[in-house]
Amino acid sequence: MGKTYVGSRLRQLRRERDLSQASLAATLGLSASYVNQIEHDVRPLTVPVLLRITEAFGVDATFFSRDDDSRLLAEVQDVMLDREINPANVELQELSEMVYNHPQLARAMVEMHQRYRNVRDKFSIAVDNRTNTPEERRPIAEAVSMPHEEVRDFIYARQNYFDALDRRAEAIAAQLGWQPYDSRAMEDSIARRLQMDHDVTITSSKEESGTLHHFDPETRLLTIHARLNPGQRAFRMATELGYLEANDLIEGIVDDGIWSTPEARTLAIRGVASYFAAAVMLPYKIFHSEAEKSGYDIEYLGQLFGVGYETTAHRLSTLQRPNLRGIPFTFVRVDRAGNMSKRQSATGFHFTHYGGTCPLWNVFETFTNPGQVLRQFAQMPDGRNYLWISRTVRHHEARFGEVDKMFAIGLGCEARHADRTVYSRGFNLQDLSTATPIGSGCRVCTRENCAQRAFPSVHGRINIDAHESTIAPY
């Protein structure tokens, strides 16, 4: 272990636990002066002290790693790329030092920029709507608040993991008696618990109204559409069980956020309740164990736990429990037009607000190979290498002639974790010449000579020779 100075991180940990330097020193069996020297980067962190900290406070060693800052660093870079507020270029090294030494300041900067973007968008809509009628203005003004983006960013900032809620769901799953390959038994167990413990009446509906389930708190009537399979029905029931048995935790998590509208807060509550349902259907320790044993085989795990491909892939991205972490995955759901309706990441992979998406990313290739699992060894401009697994999923197929919903699901991890998965078979992840060069999107991508480039990068000036043609248009 080389010399690692972790003063700001140790200070952050101490303040989070409301400890004085003397109390922390006593807990670790060190002198107060020794702890003071570590906090002020006079002494480096040694392996024995690191082990004492991880044992005493239950944090992973990665808490003190600069690699763990990569996502926050990417978010700060995103702020710096907004030319309306920052016309100058800031060196990456400067941003890296700020993120590592002052993480709370960096996070505050990112959150302030998010609020600024919301205000800017609303102001732009207000100006554009001056000639519209009141009826025309109202839906546009409501849409610009974008509550789904607020919720998405809220979950993203928490690395898609809620420890207390996950453990509560896991305990309930144990009481329900989870069994492999038997989602119908889980459905029956949840139904009995709702009926016996909460006086809920469950009924089936065949109406084609678009509603898949509905619970009336007044009548205690839960209606579930008949076309859902056992796993889907169990998931909806588990969601309502969350409101009834873990609402204190759900509300507490959501209260930790800052919401621009009541709709955003309500959407967040539903999102966190869905997280609870997934944690009941795929209990953490069992799911983590089976994932490790199977090499994170998404289709196998889906069959074992009786849920769909998307639910399984999303649950894999939540395996971030301290001292029992899975592979840190990035999860995305996109449509043919490139709209990213879901994005969560436990890695340094960052989704910029300005660059769009990269057409060389294999997530988009899956639409020409529906239902087939595709793999890609890809490299980002910063040199990080990723393994991406992508497949399409269809939602709610109904009758002939009706338009169904198709999405591409992408699950990616850094190449250093890839050998733990079945998807690395046949790949030479050491040969970087086989990696596909991708980026966050053309406007923020620094990659040169990319034939697929659609827009010039904001990182430099456009140099065009009227008498010369090149592979890249800019």
Curated annotation (Swiss-Prot):
GO terms for biological process: regulation of DNA-templated transcription. Disruption phenotype: Cells lacking this gene show high-level specific activities of acetate kinase (Ack), phosphotransacetylase (Pta), isocitrate lyase (AceA) and malate synthase (AceB) irrespective of the substrate. The transcription level of the rpf2 gene is increased 20-fold in the ramB deletion mutant during growth on acetate as the sole carbon source. Induction: RamB represses its own expression. Additionally, ramB expression is subject to carbon source-dependent positive control by RamA. InterPro entries: Bact_TransReg_Diox, Cro/C1-type_HTH, HTH_RamB, IrrE_HExxH, Lambda_DNA-bd_dom_sf, ScfR_C. The keyword Transcription applies. PROSITE patterns: HTH_CROC1 (PS50943). Keywords: DNA-binding, Repressor, Transcription, Transcription regulation. It comes from the Bacteria. CDD domains: HTH_XRE (cd00093). SMART domains: HTH_XRE (SM00530). One of its GO terms (cellular component) is cytosol. Gene3D superfamilies: lambda repressor-like DNA-binding domains. SUPFAM superfamilies: lambda repressor-like DNA-binding domains. The keyword Kinase does not apply. Pfam families: HTH_3, Peptidase_M78, ScfRs. One of its GO terms (molecular function) is DNA-binding transcription factor activity. Residues 21-40 bind DNA. Residues 10-64 form the HTH cro/C1-type domain. During growth on glucose, RamB negatively controls the expression of aceA, aceB, ack and pta genes which are involved in acetate metabolism. RamB is also a negative regulator of rpf2 gene expression during growth on acetate as the sole carbon source. Belongs to the short-chain fatty acyl-CoA assimilation regulator (ScfR) family. C.glutamicum shows high-level specific activities of acetate kinase (Ack), phosphotransacetylase (Pta), isocitrate lyase (AceA) and malate synthase (AceB) when grown on acetate as sole carbon and energy sources. It shows low-level specific activities with all four enzymes when grown on glucose as sole carbon and energy sources. NCBIfam families: Reg_Aceta_RamB. This is HTH-type transcriptional regulator RamB. The lineage of its organism: Bacteria, Bacillati, Actinomycetota, Actinomycetes, Mycobacteriales.
